[in-house]
């Protein structure tokens, strides 16, 4: 005899008005005070499900939404939505169980974003873990080249820059140094850190100071290599530092660091988690700087994070890309994210979107430079590459106040960076009209700063 059990009653979830209260019972809720309407929001416009207020999104979920929210290439294609839903029903372990969507994603990624000199791909969830696995690849490479045993590998080091943000995982915690609250009281490695010679703009005005900053940084790098006595596995840098202040570096400085790595038999590793996937107007920022990295960490806009590898990695035949389980994870990324990323990359390719990024980026940068001219001594250091643009304000307090006024008074969301930087991270599809609204909000917020 089979007993029929009454169906369990599933309690109704919270409605929009209760979201923050429901979350606050269990998680920290110190983010934006809007409740995102996942249906009404579209493109660069985020809608508050409680008030109906529309916000201009110039932060794109911390530079992770390449086409904004609910892009038409996805939501207006019912067949593709079905394909995406089918991929979301299950979560297979991609490194060991293979599917057509996985293969389609990998081939699309290689075609749209790939570098022939970096043929190896590794996928994982999270930008910090992308960097983490790039470091593991570098440690493994260096250890094999030197013939180090398990005890000796503990002497290996990572040369890196001040004001870096590379994540909050194990190895990366020793490299991130933007905000002490993110790294304090966690055990860290004492790895060599050199000054970050961020370019001051306009470049013509600050040429001598910029050259001197680069000279000091290169001297510090030379000394770090000397002191490490051959134990530096790699140099790791963001080609443009994001959270640390939207700090740009000259091609000459980065090329000099690359040359130092070659001379001292260390890998040259770039973190393009924020700057990659078209934000600067090319697939990767390093392509505009004359660089040939050995490893590149990626994430955010790519939807699936990971590492591209090549270059001198091939000097060691049994590198981590060739040996089973040297680097891996259960899921190796997320299949649903891969399906979404495939459509995003196809759209970037089909629409020649990166050409538009170059044009819109110049438009935004010109607007920021005009604001700097109108507010001398207040708005300074207008800078950008593609849509990765920023300005500086006099101090942290004034910067934060301007951002608050942009948000509360003009419904525009931008981001802080460094101690006094204000950065824009719009979707790649942003229009000149939308950039105008953002620039006008910044101008009005500056005018009302008191």
From Swiss-Prot:
Its EC number is 2.6.1.36. Its cofactor is pyridoxal 5'-phosphate. The modification N6-(pyridoxal phosphate)lysine is found at residue 300. Disulfide bonds: none annotated. One of its GO terms (molecular function) is pyridoxal phosphate binding. It catalyses: L-lysine + 2-oxoglutarate = (S)-2-amino-6-oxohexanoate + L-glutamate. GO terms for biological process: antibiotic biosynthetic process; gamma-aminobutyric acid catabolic process. L-lysine binds at residue 168. PROSITE patterns: AA_TRANSFER_CLASS_3. 2-oxoglutarate binds at residues 168, 274, 423. It is an enzyme of class 2 (transferase). Keywords: Aminotransferase, Antibiotic biosynthesis, Pyridoxal phosphate, Transferase. Pathway: Antibiotic biosynthesis; cephamycin C biosynthesis. Pyridoxal 5'-phosphate binds at residues 127-128, 274. InterPro entries: Aminotrans_3, L-lysine_6-transaminase, PyrdxlP-dep_Trfase, PyrdxlP-dep_Trfase_major, PyrdxlP-dep_Trfase_small. Catalyzes the transfer of the terminal amino group of L-lysine to alpha-ketoglutarate to yield L-glutamate and 2-aminoadipate 6-semialdehyde ((S)-2-amino-6-oxohexanoate), which is spontaneously converted to the dehydrated form 1-piperideine 6-carboxylate. Belongs to the class-III pyridoxal-phosphate-dependent aminotransferase family. This is L-lysine-epsilon aminotransferase.
């Amino acid at each position: 005899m089979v007993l029929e059990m009454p169906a369990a009653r599933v309690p109704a979830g919270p409605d929009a008005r209760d979201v923050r209260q429901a979350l606050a019972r269990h998680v920290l809720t110190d983010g934006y005070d809007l409740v995102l309407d996942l249906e009404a929001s579209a493109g660069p416009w985020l809608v508050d499900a409680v008030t109906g207020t529309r916000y201009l999104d110039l932060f794109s979920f911390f530079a992770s939404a390449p086409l904004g929210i609910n892009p038409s290439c996805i939501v207006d294609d019912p067949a593709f939505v079905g394909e995406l839903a089918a991929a979301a029903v299950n979560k297979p372990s991609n490194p060991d169980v293979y599917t057509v969507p996985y293969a389609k994603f990998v081939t699309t990624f290689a075609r749209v974003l790939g570098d022939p000199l970096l043929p190896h791909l590794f996928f994982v969830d999270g930008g910090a873990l992308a960097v983490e696995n790039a470091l593991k690849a570098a440690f493994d490479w260096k250890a094999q080249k030197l013939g180090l045993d398990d005890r000796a590998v503990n002497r290996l080091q990572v040369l890196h820059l001040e004001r870096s943000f590379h994540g909050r995982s194990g190895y990366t915690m020793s490299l991130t140094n933007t905000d002490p609250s993110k790294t304090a009281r966690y055990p860290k490695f004492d790895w060599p850190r050199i000054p970050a010679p961020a370019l001051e703009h306009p470049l013509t005005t600050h040429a001598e100071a910029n050259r001197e900053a680069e000279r000091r940084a290169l001297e510090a790098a030379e000394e770090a290599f000397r002191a490490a006595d051959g134990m530096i596995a790699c140099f790791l840098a963001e080609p443009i530092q994001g959270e640390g202040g939207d700090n740009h570096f000259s091609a000459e400085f980065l090329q000099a660091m690359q040359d130092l790595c070659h001379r001292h038999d260390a890998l040259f590793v770039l973190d393009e988690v924020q700057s990659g996937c078209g934000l600067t107007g090319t697939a990767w920022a390093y392509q505009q700087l004359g660089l040939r990295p050995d490893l590149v960490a990626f994430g955010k806009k790519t939807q699936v994070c990971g590492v591209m590898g090549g270059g001198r990695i091939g000097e060691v035949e049994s590198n981590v890309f060739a040996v089973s389980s040297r680097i891996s994870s259960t899921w190796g990324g997320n299949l649903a994210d891969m399906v979404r990323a495939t459509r995003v990359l196809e759209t970037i390719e089909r629409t020649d979107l990166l050409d538009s990024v170059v044009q819109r980026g110049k438009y935004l940068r010109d607007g920021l430079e005009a604001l700097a001219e109108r507010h001398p001594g207040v708005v300074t250091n207008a800078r950008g590459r593609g849509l990765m643009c920023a300005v500086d304000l006099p101090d942290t307090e004034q910067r934060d106040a301007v951002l608050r006024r942009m948000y509360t008074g003009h419904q525009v969301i931008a981001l802080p960076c460094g101690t006094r930087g204000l950065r824009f991270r719009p979707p790649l599809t942003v229009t000149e009209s939308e950039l105008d609204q953002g620039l006008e909000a910044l101008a009005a917020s500056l005018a009302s700063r008191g």
